[in-house]
Design a protein with these regions (language model features):
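Single, functionally critical "micro-switch" positions that shape active/binding sites
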Residues: 65-69, 97, 121
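Residues at the C-termini of beta-strands that transition into short coil/loop
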Residues: 39, 56, 162
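Conserved residues at the C-terminal ends of beta-strands
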Residues: 20, 77, 129
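Active-site gating loops and adjacent loop-to-helix segments of metal-dependent hydrolytic enzymes
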Residues: 74-107, 182-183
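Active-site loop-helix segments enriched in His/Asp/Glu that coordinate
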Residues: 99-181
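N-terminal metal-binding scaffold of metallo-dependent hydrolase/deaminase domains
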Residues: 1-46
Length: 183
């Protein structure tokens, strides 16, 4: 995922924009993806060379936030054995069995796929819970790399999540501590 895929280049003037709680339509001037001005009337000299987009009174809202996602689990239903019961506990068991078979590159590819879907639905901030009970930290390493790579287009917060429990087995608490130190 490259910033260029999701960044707006050049200047655009969005006209006849409806903002929440306002009756009067406004215009929004955007230059290289940055909001420069929101006003009822933007002087013509400020919009020379801008591509104009008429929104015909459509509502423009801030981007959405997804406060609870597990990006290391996205698109994993086809991995390993099927969750026959459909229960959370069997799902956790199936994940435990398959998570050790992935590389950081494979995990990153799935994380990027999940982020793309989120962004296409208007999400620009995600808090993801990443399993830190994998002693190789594959998911966490992948998520940390992705967070750095998308920082200009997405706010990605990472929570160190002990999927199999902090105290459920010997050393679980140490894995969580190590995951927290990693970032």
């Amino acid at each position: 995922m490259r910033k260029e895929e999701y960044s707006m280049k050049g200047s655009k003037l969005f006209k006849n924009v409806r903002l929440k709680g306002q009756k009067e339509l406004v215009s929004i001037l955007v230059e290289d993806g940055i909001f420069k001005k929101i006003a009822a009337d933007i002087p013509q000299e400020e919009t020379v060379g801008c591509e104009e987009v008429d929104l015909n009174g459509q509502l423009v809202v801030p981007p959405y936030v997804d406060p609870h996602l597990h990006l290391d689990y996205v698109f994993t239903a086809s991995l390993g054995e099927e969750n026959g019961s459909g229960t959370l506990f069997e799902g956790i068991q199936r994940w435990s069995e398959s998570k050790g078979n992935m590389t950081v590159a494979q995990m990153k590819e799935r994380i990027y796929s999940g982020i793309r879907k989120e962004m296409l639905h208007g999400v620009q901030a995600i808090r993801t819970h990443i399993d830190v009970t994998d002693p190789t930290f594959t998911g966490l390493k992948a998520a940390l790399e992705v967070r750095d790579e998308v920082k200009d287009i997405l706010d990605l917060q990472i929570v160190a999540f002990p999927q199999e429990g902090m105290y459920a087995y010997k050393g679980g608490d140490k894995l969580v501590e190590e995951g927290l130190k990693m970032g």
